[in-house]
A protein has these predicted regions:
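Histidine-dependent nucleotide/RNA phosphoesterase domain, centered on the 2H-phosphoesterase fold
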Residues: 1-226
């Protein structure tokens, strides 16, 4: 299945669930007791693209002000969840340098990767921007990460939740019941091909993060310039 068809399938399946009130309300977003943390390799889109995302979100905020909208500081693409978030993960108990070294081996110099953010898709939990890669570089990196980490003796949980192959970015999460569901779905449908632009990937970040990649909890472990 092509990436475009994957996003379309996900969109239609999720819209059906949202329409029939089978969507997932995240009750942990506002919880003071959420102790889920992990280790993730991420890409951050350009400031220009983040500005377009915030402009895009304005109309949704007017219709559904009580949902969770990602600020610019938290918008990201997950390259790989190296340690998927779990309660009370303690970074002091791992050898951080080993994670940096293993990751660096997988990020070859001269990577030529552009990502186009065009259109939106959905999940039963929220709304995502569709990301399209100009080549196989990103998935090649993921395959190298899988090989290196699975052949190592460090703690890891690659692909534990799902086999990641996309370049999407979550921008809305449902934290309350949709108060104007029909208007929200109509706006989604009208925005399905929204063009956010293209950016060149020139760095990757290895971060310690909470489930939502919120700035106040994220600690940058290492930045890899490619």
């Amino acid at each position: 299945m092509t990436l475009e068809n994957h996003y379309k399938k996900l969109y239609h399946e999720s819209i059906n669930k949202i329409s029939s009130d089978n969507y997932h309300i995240d009750t942990l977003i506002d919880s003071k007791n959420d102790r889920r943390f992990g280790l993730t390799l991420i890409i951050r889109p350009s400031n220009e693209i983040k500005k377009k995302i915030q402009n895009f979100l304005k109309n949704f905020k007017e219709i559904e002000p009580n949902q969770y909208y990602y600020p610019n500081s938290d918008i990201h693409i997950t390259v790989m969840s190296i340690i998927s978030c779990y309660s009370d993960f303690d970074m002091s108990k791992i050898d951080v340098q080993k994670y940096i070294d293993l990751t660096e081996k997988c990020l070859l110099k001269g990577i030529d990767l552009n990502i186009t953010f065009k259109g939106i898709t959905a999940s039963p939990s929220g709304v995502m921007v569709q990301g399209f890669m100009n080549n196989n570089e990103l998935n090649d990196i993921r395959n190298r990460l899988r090989k290196e980490f699975k052949n190592s003796n460090v703690e890891q949980s690659l692909d534990k939740r799902y086999l990641i192959q996309t370049a999407h970015s979550t921008i809305i999460r449902f934290r309350k019941e949709l108060s104007q569901k029909e208007k929200f779905l109509e706006l989604l449908d009208n925005s399905i091909n929204y063009d956010f632009g293209t950016f060149k990937v020139n760095k990757f970040e290895l971060v310690y993060n909470d489930w939502y990649q919120r700035e106040q909890y994220v600690k940058k472990i290492h930045e890899f310039v490619v």
